[in-house]
């Protein structure tokens, strides 16, 4: 979303090749009047960022994300990074949303933050007051940097699909105990080949009676946000490896 082009100008001045995705036709005309093609350094793709095909040669993503689509855009960024690794992502989002992304504070784990944790270290940067924008929103924004990491645990690569299913399932009722939450079969478990209600029930019984190494005896009496991301990864891998 290049919009009026302020960020685009700064990126071009850095010597970067810039690709912008802009849905507004008037904004595109404005950008063309101001920049032209910037000596071949600027390409504007017209369309909805949630629907158009992204170029396959991106190295960095720098954007001021609209609040209402921040979550789906982040999901697309993560999908893109999984296919074609990015070097860094710097975005501006709503302050509260940024805290959910980073999980920096005790008890702040969330499905959003845990999903991002699979691929990135999330670093909070400067707050930006609403008055910095026109029209001014009623909330503050926050700069966030996503630094790619190669995430794994002791017993190998993390089962990403199972990890996401389990964390979404448990954090949908985050005030309940983990044992209570895991006793119910996730609605999306059938999306994983070979998984069904009876296999899930047996896997959870095995997990509860034989805790993973390093887990406390009554770990399952905690609420979901009391565990570390690494522990959720261990749980996901332990469940996914269970054979009836």
Positions of PLM-derived features:
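Catalytic cores of RNA-modifying enzymes
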Residues: 1-169, 231-244
């Amino acid at each position: 979303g290049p919009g009026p082009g302020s960020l685009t100008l700064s990126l071009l001045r850095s010597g970067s090749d810039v690709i912008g995705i802009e849905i507004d036709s008037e904004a595109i005309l404005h950008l063309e009047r101001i920049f032209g093609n910037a000596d071949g350094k600027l390409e504007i793709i017209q369309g909805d960022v949630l629907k158009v095909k992204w170029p396959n040669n991106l190295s960095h993503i720098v954007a001021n994300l609209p609040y209402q689509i921040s979550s789906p855009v982040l999901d697309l960024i993560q999908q893109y990074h999984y296919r074609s690794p990015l070097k860094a992502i710097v975005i501006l989002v709503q302050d509260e949303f940024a805290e959910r992304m980073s999980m920096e504070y005790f008890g702040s784990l969330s499905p959003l933050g845990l999903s991002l944790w699979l691929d990135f270290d999330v670093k909070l940067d400067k707050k930006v007051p609403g008055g910095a924008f026109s029209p001014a929103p009623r909330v503050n924004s926050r700069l966030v940097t996503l630094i790619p990491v190669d995430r794994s645990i002791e017993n190998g690569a993390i089962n990403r699909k199972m990890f996401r299913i389990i964390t979404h399932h448990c954090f949908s009722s985050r005030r309940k105990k983990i044992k209570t939450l895991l006793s119910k079969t996730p609605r999306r478990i059938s999306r994983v080949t070979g998984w069904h209600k009876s296999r899930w029930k047996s896997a959870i019984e095995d997990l509860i009676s034989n805790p993973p190494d390093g887990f406390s005896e009554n770990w399952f009496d905690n609420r979901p946000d009391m565990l570390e991301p690494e522990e959720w990864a261990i749980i996901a891998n332990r469940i996914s490896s269970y054979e009836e």
